[in-house]
Amino acid sequence: MILIIYAHPYPHHSHANKRMLEQARTLEGVEIRSLYQLYPDFNIDIAAEQEALSRADLIVWQHPMQWYSIPPLLKLWIDKVFSHGWAYGHGGTALHGKHLLWAVTTGGGESHFEIGAHPGFDVLSQPLQATAIYCGLNWLPPFAMHCTFICDDETLEGQARHYKQRLLEWQEAHHG
């Protein structure tokens, strides 16, 4: 099962992430948990989230990039749900062997994330990748949709279909 942990602080204003979710919903075996809809008060139901994660083979963290980072509720979700003794530490093997895909949208172009004036995209992913590896997850190459503020509808739809294809290819490779 693919579990998408969706963290968009303003989902009604989304153009790119909305299309990505629409494409993902067309696949069998996909569950979407929209954190800002489930937890507008930031009071996370840790047991419910851990139960959802236990059913997943692929976990997707999908969100818009905010100031070169993840939205605050996703950070809190990771801090609370990936708890000691469950996700890491003595007895913390609940996530071992599962896969993690970071699916992120950005307003800037791909060149904006090249080493130079701004941090490279690989540098930005390091804290997430380190968290995944520390918890025994298999880190997959990220999916990034760039220039989402200026893309036309056709481009956004094409990128959303590409996202669906990434998920489908993972399903086929792991579940035949």
From Swiss-Prot:
Its cofactor is FMN. SUPFAM superfamilies: Flavoproteins. Keywords: Cell inner membrane, Cell membrane, Flavoprotein, FMN, Membrane, NAD, Oxidoreductase. It is found in: Cell inner membrane. It catalyses: a quinone + NADH + H(+) = a quinol + NAD(+); a quinone + NADPH + H(+) = a quinol + NADP(+). FMN binds at H8, S14, H15, A16, N17, M65, Q66, W67, Y68, T105, T106, G107, G108. One of its GO terms (cellular component) is potassium:proton antiporter complex. One of its GO terms (biological process) is potassium ion transport. It is a peripheral membrane protein. Changing G107S: Does not bind FMN. Lacks oxidoreductase activity, but is still able to activate potassium efflux. Changing H112W: Lacks oxidoreductase activity, but is still able to activate potassium efflux. Signal peptide: none annotated. It is an enzyme of class 1 (oxidoreductase). One of its GO terms (molecular function) is electron transfer activity. Its EC number is 1.6.5.2. NCBIfam families: PRK00871.1. Belongs to the NAD(P)H dehydrogenase (quinone) family. KefF subfamily. Regulatory subunit of a potassium efflux system that confers protection against electrophiles. Required for full activity of KefC. Shows redox enzymatic activity, but this enzymatic activity is not required for activation of KefC. Can use a wide range of substrates, including electrophilic quinones, and its function could be to reduce the redox toxicity of electrophilic quinones in parallel with acting as triggers for the KefC efflux system. Homodimer. Interacts with KefC, forming a heterotetramer with 2:2 stoichiometry. This is Glutathione-regulated potassium-efflux system ancillary protein KefF. The lineage of its organism: Bacteria, Pseudomonadati, Pseudomonadota, Gammaproteobacteria, Enterobacterales.
